[in-house]
Amino acid sequence: MIQPQTHLNVADNSGARELMCIRILGASNHRYAHIGDVIVAVIKEAVPNMPLERSEVVRAVIVRTCKELKRDNGMIIRYDDNAAVVIDQEGNPKGTRVFGAIARELRQLNFAKIVSLAPEVL
């Protein structure tokens, strides 16, 4: 469960290392974001000499959460960290690589480009 002020790792090579959630997009009364939700975040830590810089406001999609994700078949998936992938206004990733495992639910949410870049889909 991601809420405003939550710090997340970045799971791509866009240049950001750590994000802080400042808003959850989609509905005005969402308190928590789950896997597949789009958030507005600020970059708290960035790699030097990259396009994205510290204190820049970006959009990101949640790809991993520590909170369990329960599937319809009864399977429960839990990750070790909270992570997101930085995206542009059209929903395409800003980076060219995605690190770590990605949930299968992103494919149904029209993030097929992120799923295709991921090394492992759970």
From Swiss-Prot:
Keywords: Chloroplast, Plastid, Ribonucleoprotein, Ribosomal protein, RNA-binding, rRNA-binding. GO terms for cellular component: chloroplast; cytosolic large ribosomal subunit. GO terms for molecular function: large ribosomal subunit rRNA binding; structural constituent of ribosome. It is found in: Plastid, Chloroplast. InterPro entries: Ribosomal_uL14, Ribosomal_uL14_bac-type, Ribosomal_uL14_CS, Ribosomal_uL14_sf. It comes from the Eukaryota. The keyword rRNA-binding applies. Gene3D superfamilies: Ribosomal protein L14. Belongs to the universal ribosomal protein uL14 family. Part of the 50S ribosomal subunit. This is Large ribosomal subunit protein uL14c.
